[in-house]
């Protein structure tokens, strides 16, 4: 009995050890597989926590600033309302509408006395008749554009033409967003955030103007809130109120929560010293996209020469740093970040021009410079701005275009006059498109449309960028394509709305 009992205990002990070993192995396997199986879910949860920033979002705002289900990418351009004038003579119908998803119309200004927003150029915005030149360019529109009865009801100005184009361009759907502010009007943001009455009037006026003129959303361009407590917090309050007002308009039109949505975006600084003081995580709850201005890293204000729209560098002045700062520090969803690119170059007159014969290995950055180059007929013809070169006129006559793959920037150098110009070209924007897809960003945009090489497809920045995206560009239609929006507009404004005659014409054409 003693021997049998010992043998039994031995077998029991062996079984126990095997069970313990099996449990241990199971735990190890589960730990190894956990990260692999649940990594994405955990990342989403962490990202959501960062986005909420520990603050509960009001029920009528929740998720309304995060419409990022579209798997396609943004390919957008800013169009300025001074573009139709000399020396640019650039009109909305000159944009390659087949290749863009968003056009940001710049700019509306703030009335500092009332808080309301106003046109910066009423003639360009609402009165200029562009249909004759449009009809000449695009023969398929000649019939309607030359029809006198129809011509009298077409909305005028650049804004009117853009609305017309997004209702007639069958090849590609795109949105037009109203941009408020800009560098020259940013001081007025500081005024309205200090006065609740002015701020409320700004919000009401912005949404009213956006809808009355047929825009698909609002883009805020405050350059830039101060590095203090009051202005960043005031910006947060402004954005929150604006999103609530847009939500209210959506509820009146659609009656309930819907995917149909007026977009709210921010043209954001891409410098650490500006981003650091902004309540990004809290603002992020209310916006759809951050248009990151990842350009103008170097210019006339700099101490040395540099690439002004580079993707990488040894310093923090580059697009890659700005994108990852938004993601890693503030927890912004990468799909809400839109990479900014420049359709222009910045020039420098290098002080030390004692180079060996210039070649692609010649170092032209981090050099002392004396101005940005004297005005020449070439510059005057280009844009009239010293130191600014529209991409379509680059490389400079007499130079050879170069490309720096380390920084992802193009440049050219005029040896005779010691002028160095940095800019984006087809190589750099295609690399940036690959960067966008690799990092799952929201897309890209350009400041501004007049610099694009529309006449030469092989030099087109937009075409090269879209090619890098494998032409996976968003084609969501304007919110004004929805019959409910048109009906609400006509009920609200009757025959007196800016778009009323044309909207009635569209309805009659469908019947």
Curated annotation (Swiss-Prot):
PROSITE patterns: GH18_1 (PS01095), GH18_2 (PS51910). Residues 1-34 form the signal peptide. GO terms for biological process: chitin catabolic process; polysaccharide catabolic process; sporulation resulting in formation of a cellular spore. Keywords: Carbohydrate metabolism, Chitin degradation, Glycoprotein, Glycosidase, Hydrolase, Polysaccharide degradation, Secreted, Signal, Sporulation. Residues 73-472 form the GH18 domain. Glycans are attached at residues 147, 228, 456, 472. Its EC number is 3.2.1.14. SUPFAM superfamilies: (Trans)glycosidases, Chitinase insertion domain. Pfam families: Glyco_hydro_18. Disulfide bonds: none annotated. The active site is at residue 223. It is found in: Secreted. It comes from the Eukaryota. One of its GO terms (cellular component) is cytoplasm. One of its GO terms (molecular function) is chitin binding. It catalyses: Random endo-hydrolysis of N-acetyl-beta-D-glucosaminide (1->4)-beta-linkages in chitin and chitodextrins. It is an enzyme of class 3 (hydrolase). Present with 3050 molecules/cell in log phase SD medium. Belongs to the glycosyl hydrolase 18 family. Chitinase class III subfamily. PANTHER family: CHITINASE, CHITINASE 12-RELATED. This is Sporulation-specific chitinase 2. The lineage of its organism: Eukaryota, Fungi, Dikarya, Ascomycota, Saccharomycotina. The gene is CTS2.
